[in-house]
Design a protein with these regions (language model features):
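Gly/Ser/Thr/Pro-rich low-complexity, intrinsically disordered segments
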Residues: 1-150
Length: 150
């Protein structure tokens, strides 16, 4: 799907990819339906097109699969787009279904949330006092998202 990093398009919009797209521009994040994306959105600093959308306008999206447990990675928009949180479940566990993850994110206050991936690609790394800590195998990762504190 559509990927933009630092304003550079790495992959084009895929109109037939159902789901949603995270767009970040002018220090604001939003998640829009992929079908509503123009072919070449202007002014985008970061974009990730994926599926399924889990939360829309603070409510669980209907039709999410109630079965199929896996490690999950998701993004959550809050505070009118001023806050973008990344969530990942413990890759060593069976993980939630998409419906369970969406319910939890809605209850946790996400105005919008997007599932990124699951299974063996679920991973994170961060720099702590003891160096870089890695969580999950992070297999088959064509892209990653890097966060900086502001």
């Amino acid at each position: 799907g559509y990927v933009v990093s630092q304003g550079v398009q790495l992959s084009p919009v895929r109109p037939k990819l159902d789901g949603a797209t995270l767009l970040v521009s002018e220090a604001r994040a939003r998640i829009v339906r992929s079908a509503q994306l123009p072919r070449t959105p202007a002014g985008v600093e970061l974009a990730v097109q994926c599926k399924p959308r889990l939360v829309e306008a603070g409510k669980l999206v209907s039709g999410l699969k109630p079965e199929g447990r896996a490690a999950r990675t998701a993004l959550c928009v809050r505070d009118a787009g001023r806050t973008l949180d990344a969530y990942l479940t413990d890759p060593a566990e069976r993980g939630p279904t998409l419906a369970e993850l969406g319910s939890w994110l809605a209850a946790d206050g996400c105005s919008d949330a997007l599932n990124l991936d699951g299974g063996p690609s679920t991973a994170a790394a961060y720099r702590g006092e003891a160096g870089v800590l890695r969580i999950g195998p992070g297999e088959f990762l064509p892209y990653s998202i890097r966060f900086w504190p502001r």
